[in-house]
Curated annotation (Swiss-Prot):
The gene is thyX. A motif (ThyX motif) lies at residues 96-106. Binds 4 FAD per tetramer. Each FAD binding site is formed by three monomers. This is Flavin-dependent thymidylate synthase. Keywords: FAD, Flavoprotein, Methyltransferase, NADP, Nucleotide biosynthesis, Transferase. FAD binds at T73, R96, H97, R98, E104, N205, L206, H207, H211. Its EC number is 2.1.1.148.
Amino acid sequence: MHNTTKRVTVPALEAMLYETIKVLDHGFIRVIDYMGDDSSIVQAARVSYGKGTKQLNQDKGLINYLLRHYHTTPFEMCDIKFHIKLPIFIARQWIRHRTASVNEYSARYSILGNEFYLPDPANIASQSVVNKQCRAGDSVPKKVSEKVLAILEEDARRCYRHYKELMNADEDGNILDENVSGIARELARINLTLNYYTEWYWKINLHNLLHFLRLRTDPKAQYEIRVYAEKILDIVKAWVPFTYEAFEEYRLQGANISRKGLEVIKRMIKGEKVIHETSGMNKREWEELVKIFR
């Protein structure tokens, strides 16, 4: 059967459909479907039909303008749907981005597989003393990381063993002991550790996806969600290359500067030597401003 379509397609993204992109030790990302491309954004912005007579460089310039000036609705005309397998503790962080449609694997209806995440020793670090929500930059000593991994694996395996015991069923749903009555799956699951994997379908428009990527590809984002975001960023690059370039230029590699920060820069341009004490900024704001220009 010969399939044809009148909708816009992107050859680079078509080649990615249903392909498994590995993430972490057992996770993955798969592109399931998408709608629109760079031309869809331009079309919506111009409120016209078809690609029209505009040159590609004009389309690119318009996309740059739209992103630079924080226009949102043209980017909402593009959608993409992913199938993602990820650790539960990352899923709970991910779902904070509420502007998406999500359908997750049900551990009330089905039995979770015996797959759990263990971090690479290089990514095991102590708590940061500067940022209360993330780890420090340096890895812990080898002896410490080995102990951490042993504890995580031991706890995960023990909890999964008890999970099966509580249900009186194995991973495939087979009864373990005919003389024992197991409890409901919705109750048995509460004993599992957060490093077990879940799966979901996640559909989101391009505007909200770019917001997700801006936050989750940031170096301060947790490593385990950042690696997913980086893979999705590569997908966006293949899907909407003009938008990706504008996003990189104005969001990822650009910087927001406060009113006080601008005043400091103006004073410096005029030749004045400005230090933290004379800047009118608090210590953290000053450090962030200095970091931009390093």
